[in-house]
């Protein structure tokens, strides 16, 4: 009798995706982050669902309902902090996953990569709206500042902002719709993830060498299921350490003060995972220019396949571009640090220099170094 997993219509899909999937034999731990992102998404949906059962999306009771979850609901504090810190773990895995894709040239899988960029935007939107829900000071002012950026759009800007707000200020209507969107987006993300995997399985996985691995494939199960399980255990260890010992490490103390439209916090800043983009936004003195730079800082990923000049796919054997890549990583860390600093000298200058070098490395230096390496290997035509 044939195994049910190979005949049953539903089991067959699962079998071809997670069990009998032919996988390159040499993929390293950098390939673990896809499954870890899936785990993060599941944790976020489950904890978010339980939080939604007790949360009220009304300006008068939102802050109190979060306090109620932490104080009165059974293990509410655990669910709340798992959700808040789970978002941080999600973005850590996300940045490492994207970084791996850039390093090993995975962006040459155009469809998979573009869905990935859309996923990144969807996750950033979800995280931003989730940050508004506790209705603390930073929630309110973060929502005000970021939504206000849309007013930079010529002609329709002001109307667009008021339409998103549902009034003339961030108020009850804004909070209610943000809660609705924050609830629905993770399910849209889940659908996009399935499409992401569908496109990936059309081509098969990339590997560290960037070479064709058809000659050396192994089944996904048990080799990579066990490897992913180890990664999952490490992720849960990190997450629970954060939740149980340092729950407020990555949060903002201002968010423990209820939202007050009459009192602006001295330093408005987003969550740590948006600081690099926030620094790029702030480094341009023009409002519209800043907004465009902010969008482009993420959208630039979509242009990577067009900027690939080398005849080699991966950076494994390309020392010049490798150096530029790690300069880019250092640059992003500097931008993250600057984004959390006040708008004053020398931080503004550092932010501007880091923003210029960020775009220069990606758009100019990396394509040039790819051509130089081809020339050095006498590979150029």
Curated annotation (Swiss-Prot):
Q: Which residues bind a ubiquinone?
A: 201
Q: Which organism is it from?
A: Apomys gracilirostris
Any single GO CC term annotated in Swiss-Prot or TrEMBL for this entry: mitochondrial inner membrane
Iron among keywords: yes
The record makes one more remark, namely:
Heme 1 (or BL or b562) is low-potential and absorbs at about 562 nm, and heme 2 (or BH or b566) is high-potential and absorbs at about 566 nm.
* Matching PANTHER family: CYTOCHROME B (PTHR19271:SF16)
Query: Sorted alphabetically, which PROSITE patterns does this protein's record hold?
Result: CYTB_CTER, CYTB_NTER
Q: How does it sit in the membrane?
A: Multi-pass membrane protein
The UniProt keywords, alphabetically, are: Electron transport, Heme, Iron, Membrane, Metal-binding, Mitochondrion, Mitochondrion inner membrane, Respiratory chain, Transmembrane, Transmembrane helix, Transport, Ubiquinone
Q: Which family is this protein grouped under?
A: Belongs to the cytochrome b family.
Source domain of life is Eukaryota
Subcellular localization(s) per the UniProt record: Mitochondrion inner membrane
Q: How is the cofactor bound?
A: Binds 2 heme b groups non-covalently.
Q: Listed GO molecular functions?
A: metal ion binding; ubiquinol-cytochrome-c reductase activity
Q: Does the keyword Electron transport apply?
A: yes
Task: Give the InterPro entries listed for this entry.
Answer: Cyt_b/b6_C (IPR005798), Cyt_b/b6_C_sf (IPR036150), Cyt_b/b6_N (IPR005797), Cytb/b6-like_sf (IPR027387), Cytochrome_b (IPR030689), Cytochrome_b_C_euk/bac (IPR048260), Cytochrome_b_N_euk/bac (IPR048259), Di-haem_cyt_TM (IPR016174)
Protein's job: Component of the ubiquinol-cytochrome c reductase complex (complex III or cytochrome b-c1 complex) that is part of the mitochondrial respiratory chain. The b-c1 complex mediates electron transfer from ubiquinol to cytochrome c. Contributes to the generation of a proton gradient across the mitochondrial membrane that is then used for ATP synthesis.
GO BP field: mitochondrial electron transport, ubiquinol to cytochrome c
Segments spanning the bilayer are: 33-53, 77-98, 113-133, 178-198, 226-246, 288-308, 320-340, 347-367
Q: What is its main location?
A: mitochondrion
Q: How is this protein named in the record?
A: Cytochrome b
Q: Subunit structure of this entry? A: The cytochrome bc1 complex contains 11 subunits: 3 respiratory subunits (MT-CYB, CYC1 and UQCRFS1), 2 core proteins (UQCRC1 and UQCRC2) and 6 low-molecular weight proteins (UQCRH/QCR6, UQCRB/QCR7, UQCRQ/QCR8, UQCR10/QCR9, UQCR11/QCR10 and a cleavage product of UQCRFS1). This cytochrome bc1 complex then forms a dimer.
Q: Which residues bind heme b b562?
A: 83, 182
The protein's required cofactor(s) are namely: heme b
Which residues make up the binding site for heme b b566?
Answer: 97, 196
């Amino acid at each position: 009798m044939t195994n049910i997993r190979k005949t049953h219509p539903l089991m067959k899909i699962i079998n071809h995706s997670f069990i009998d999937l032919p996988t390159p034999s040499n993929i390293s731990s950098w390939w673990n982050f896809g499954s870890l992102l899936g785990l993060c998404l599941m944790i976020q949906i489950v904890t978010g669902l339980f939080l939604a059962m007790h949360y009220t999306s009304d300006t008068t009771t939102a802050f109190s309902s979060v306090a109620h979850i932490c104080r009165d609901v059974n293990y509410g504090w655990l669910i709340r902090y798992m959700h808040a810190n789970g978002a941080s773990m999600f973005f850590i895995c996300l940045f490492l996953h994207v970084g791996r894709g850039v390093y090993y040239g995975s962006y040459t899988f155009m469809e998979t990569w573009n869905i990935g960029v859309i996923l990144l935007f969807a996750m950033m939107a979800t995280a931003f709206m989730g940050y508004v829900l506790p209705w603390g000071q930073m929630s309110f002012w973060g929502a005000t500042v970021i939504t206000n950026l849309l007013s930079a759009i010529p002609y329709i800007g002001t109307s667009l902002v008021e339409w998103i707000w549902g009034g003339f200020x961030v108020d009850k209507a804004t909070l209610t719709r943000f809660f609705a969107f924050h609830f629905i987006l993770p399910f849209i993300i889940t659908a996009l993830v399935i499409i992401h995997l569908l496109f990936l399985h059309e081509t098969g996985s990339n590997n560290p060498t960037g070479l064709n691995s058809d000659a050396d494939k192994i089944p996904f199960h048990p080799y990579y299921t066990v490897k992913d399980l180890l990664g999952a255990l490490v992720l849960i260890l990190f997450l629970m350490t954060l939740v149980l010992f340092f729950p407020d490490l990555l949060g903002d103390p201002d968010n423990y003060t209820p939202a007050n439209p009459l009192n602006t916090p001295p330093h408005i800043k987003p969550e740590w995972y948006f600081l690099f983009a926030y620094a790029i936004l702030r480094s341009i003195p023009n409002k519209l220019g800043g907004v465009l730079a902010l969008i482009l800082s993420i959208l630039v990923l979509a242009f990577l396949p067009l900027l690939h000049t080398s005849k080699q796919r991966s950076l494994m054997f390309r020392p010049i571009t490798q150096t530029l890549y790690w300069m880019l990583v250092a640059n992003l860390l500097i931008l993250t640090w600057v984004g959390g600093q006040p708008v004053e000298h020398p931080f503004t200058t550092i932010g501007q220099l880091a923003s210029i070098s960020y775009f220069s490395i990606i758009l100019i230096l990396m394509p040039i170094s790819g051509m130089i390496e081809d020339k050095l290997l006498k590979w150029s035509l």
